[in-house]
Amino acid sequence: MAIISLAEMMESGVHFGHQTRRWNPRMAPYIYTARNGVHIIDLVKTAQCVETAYRWVRTNAEQGKRFLFVGTKRQAAGIIAEEATRCGSYYINQRWLGGMLTNWATIKGRVDRLKELERMGETGALALRPKKEAAVLRRELERLQKYLGGIKNMRRLPDAVVIIDQKREYNAVQECQKLGIPIVAMLDTNCDPDVVDVPIPGNDDAIRSVKLIVSKLADAIYEARHGAAPVAEEYDYDGAEDEYEDDADEA
């Protein structure tokens, strides 16, 4: 049985790329044509890449490898948290802090601080502090939960990283390259496939497209650890917007 079908990719808008003037020529092998000034991604190539990525991820998950999902754009943030949690992986979905991987010792210190503050809240120790001090500590806790909540149980560097929008998450890509951590990445037509290990060409700006691809990768991890994956819950699209142009230039 195919991992992904052309019909579900069409329905999710996986084939829509960026405006032709904003393309990266290295994505040419994955582009089918251009229509009305917009590149159309070759979904046959995408299906092949999804199949390859699924097998690669599942094989590594079966070997006990741990995955970190990264996607900080609005369209991806909720999906990243939901799918990474579903398959028991780590995630970063707010802001990539410099040195998140290359300076892991320091980041781990902040993660330990997050756990300490959470314990204080759970035991009631936080409420016993003077009002002003407690307020400061709660703000610190909220900030740490926002940026590090998805990796608070990560004891060491991940074995592989799944990235949505290689161009936007450039800093994460660079850190993975420095450390030799394999990258699985969803790439729009403005991205560079040469800087990742397992490319998946597809629309990384449309919510349904991101959901479809990320859920397949999460399925691979879940199935490797638990057997057949449950049907992924329908993502709540209210309040989230598809954006085809704005976010890609922020990296």
Curated annotation (Swiss-Prot):
Q: Name one GO cellular component term.
A: cytosolic small ribosomal subunit
Give the stretches traversing the membrane: none
Domain of life the protein comes from: Bacteria
Any GO molecular function: structural constituent of ribosome
Note the CDD domains from the entry.
Answer: RPS2 (cd01425)
Key words, A-Z: Ribonucleoprotein, Ribosomal protein
The family database entries (InterPro entries) matched by this protein are listed as: Ribosomal_uS2, Ribosomal_uS2_bac/mit/plastid, Ribosomal_uS2_CS, Ribosomal_uS2_flav_dom_sf
GO biological process terms held by the UniProt record: translation
What does the similarity note say? Answer: Belongs to the universal ribosomal protein uS2 family.
Checking NCBIfam families in the record gives: rpsB_bact (TIGR01011)
Please report the name of this protein according to its UniProt entry.
Small ribosomal subunit protein uS2
Annotated source species: Synechococcus sp. (strain ATCC 27144 / PCC 6301 / SAUG 1402/1)
Q: Which gene encodes it?
A: rpsB
